[in-house]
Swiss-Prot record:
PROSITE patterns: GATASE_TYPE_1. One of its GO terms (biological process) is pyrimidine nucleobase biosynthetic process. The gene is pyrG. This is CTP synthase. CTPSs have evolved a hybrid strategy for distinguishing between UTP and CTP. The overlapping regions of the product feedback inhibitory and substrate sites recognize a common feature in both compounds, the triphosphate moiety. To differentiate isosteric substrate and product pyrimidine rings, an additional pocket far from the expected kinase/ligase catalytic site, specifically recognizes the cytosine and ribose portions of the product inhibitor. Catalyzes the ATP-dependent amination of UTP to CTP with either L-glutamine or ammonia as the source of nitrogen. Regulates intracellular CTP levels through interactions with the four ribonucleotide triphosphates. ATP binds at S14, L15, G16, K17, G18, I19, D71. UTP binds at S13, K186, T187, K188, P189, T190, Q191, K222. GO terms for molecular function: ATP binding; CTP synthase activity; glutaminase activity; identical protein binding; metal ion binding.
Length: 543
């Protein structure tokens, strides 16, 4: 029997529902249960693919090419279970599907309404494909009380009746603010948030209370009394120094035991949290420190690079060092010309993905600085394209080398990809067509050149990595660029699409068209990030 745990949030946003959900999933996994995680987002966009990084943060890509919420990255990093398109649904997608059915006549001329048609579609999304799992954890985005969330909350209320309360549980995350003037935690916001949830017919069975300090027993009993839950089900979600300490912290608070008790499952035994203890120890007790400069376009909102920051942390874990990140807006180099001053202390330089001409020249300057000063460099997606353009301009005698993304150019080192293969099917993008879902998205295979640095890093010559890009390095320039010393060390299986370039004579210079950060886990760091940080450690020692 599959059991469903629904996680909602109240009082304020950004309390960490995604981390809390992932931590609970990790605890259930540690007890031997098979888990699946899903996210319901109440915005009207069909997916976050066309949303600004400043609005939404990172777009996380799944193996099957779905553009999803960044919380799915947390789910994968905590559980190791690869998410799919079915695991992230928005109001926009639900409405789009229902309207498409209405146009086909699927509703036989009936009046299409939020209840039952929208709520039924939501329920189908929640339960479809879950039979093989012991637990399915479903996070509902937004905050209880938001009008956008109402159809999802109504669907949950109905599902509890459809499946039975013995098969479903509701966990509500709230804020317990501490008021210094009063010298106490205030429970009223939690009480009102639960009342808001009760008003739509949902009684939570557990409260996860975000706080910067332990909850006194008298306050715990007060919350339980006013919110109609057991005192043992009032769990303190304490602030921690690393998100990877959350499974341990929540277990110490009794969260997993209370979930199992509710479902009438054995809970006396202890879960195996040894790998989480090792990860936390490695983070808290590093043997050294390196500084990585990240020259990006969206550094004003660091959630735009959430998986990247986590992957660098994982690389630090693999090398027993603390990784200090220096976030630099690439336009700063264009405006101030202070690249040497800003990068002089960097042990490694990373240029991440992005779209558009803004800040591109600053990224090219960062590539040149890393190449000329022999500093470890990793370019990702757009970063690889800028590395190739820098090579063409500086070494191959092509000063006008550019990308067609920026406008017409005589030397299109990077061009619009209008056709590519997925399996046996050829996919095409029309000029002027919709942007949503039109990129090369998802996991694709690549072949690495035997004996290359990147093949040595991976320990194999065949890989499969996740992509999200619309422009591609022009392979017609391959021979000319390789004469300068740049090596095309990874290609698509048909040899048409460049996937990896490197400078064999450089201390460590690798650029990839894909997004390796999306596959990195704290207990299984991606080899590129482990190798990149290892090179940074060498550079730090050299200094």
């Amino acid at each position: 029997m599959t059991r469903f745990v629904f996680i909602t949030g109240g009082v304020v946003s950004s309390l960490g529902k995604g981390i809390a959900s992932a931590a609970l999933a990790a605890l259930l996994q540690a007890r031997g249960y098979k888990v699946r995680m899903r996210k319901l987002d109440p915005y009207l966009n069909v997916d976050p693919g066309t949303m600004s990084p400043y609005q939404h943060g990172e777009v996380f890509i799944t193996d099957d090419g779905a553009e999803t919420d960044l919380d799915l990255g947390h789910y994968e990093r905590f559980t190791g279970v690869h998410a799919s398109r079915a695991d992230n649904t928005t109001t926009g997608r639900i409405y789009s599907d229902v309207i498409a059915r209405e146009r086909r006549g699927d509703y036989l001329g009936g009046t299409v309404q939020v209840i039952p048609h929208i709520t039924d579609a939501i329920k189908d999304v929640v339960v479809t494909g879950t039979d093989d799992y012991d637990f399915v954890l479903v996070e509902i985005g937004g905050t209880v009380g938001d009008i956008e969330s109402l159809p999802f909350l109504e669907a949950i209320r109905q599902l509890r009746n459809d499946l039975g309360h013995a098969q479903t549980m509701c966990v509500h995350l709230t804020l317990l603010p501490y008021i210094p003037a009063a010298g106490e935690l205030k429970t009223k916001p939690t009480q009102h948030s639960v009342k808001e949830l009760q008003n739509v017919g949902i009684q939570p069975q557990m409260l996860l209370c975000r706080s910067d300090r332990p909850i006194p027993d008298n306050e715990r009993r007060k919350i339980a009394n006013f919110c109609n839950v057991r005192p043992e089900a009032v769990i303190a979600a304490l602030d921690v120094d690393t998100i990877y300490a959350c499974p341990i912290s929540y277990h110490n608070e009794g969260m997993d035991q209370e979930v199992l008790r509710y479902f009438d499952l054995p809970y006396d035994s202890k879960p195996d949290l040894s790998r989480w203890e090792k990860i936390v120890h490695a983070i808290r007790e590093p043997e050294g420190e390196v500084r990585v400069a990240i020259v990006g376009k969206y550094t004003a909102l660091l959630d735009s690079y959430k998986s990247l920051a986590e992957a660098l942390l994982h690389g630090g874990i693999a090398n027993h060092v603390k990784v200090k990140l220096d976030w630099i807006e690439s336009e700063e180099f264009e405006k101030n010309g202070n690249i040497a001053e800003r990068l002089k202390d960097a042990d490694a330089i990373l240029v991440p993905g992005g779209f558009g001409e803004r800040g591109a020249e600053g990224k090219i300057q960062a590539v040149r600085y890393a190449r000329e000063h022999n500093i470890p460099f990793l370019g990702i997606c757009f970063g690889m394209q800028m590395a190739v353009i820098e090579c063409a301009r500086s070494l191959a005698g092509l000063p006008k080398a550019s990308s067609t993304e920026f406008g017409p150019t005589d030397e299109p080192l990077v061009g619009l990809m209008t056709e590519w293969a997925r399996g046996s099917e050829m996919l095409r993008r029309r000029e002027g067509g919709d942007l949503g879902g039109t990129m090369r998205l998802g996991a694709y295979p690549a072949k690495l050149v035997p004996g290359s640095r990147v093949a040595e890093i991976y320990g194999r010559t065949e890989i499969r990595e996740r992509h999200r890009h619309r422009w591609e390095v022009n392979a017609h320039y391959k021979d000319r660029l390789e004469k300068t010393g740049l090596r095309f060390s990874g290609l698509s299986p048909d040899g048409v699409l460049p996937e990896v370039v490197e400078y064999p004579d450089h201390a460590w210079f690798v650029a990839v068209q894909y997004h390796p950060e999306l596959l990195s886990k704290p207990f299984d760091p991606h080899p590129l990030f482990a190798g990149f940080i290892a090179a940074a450690v060498k550079e730090a020692h050299r200094k």
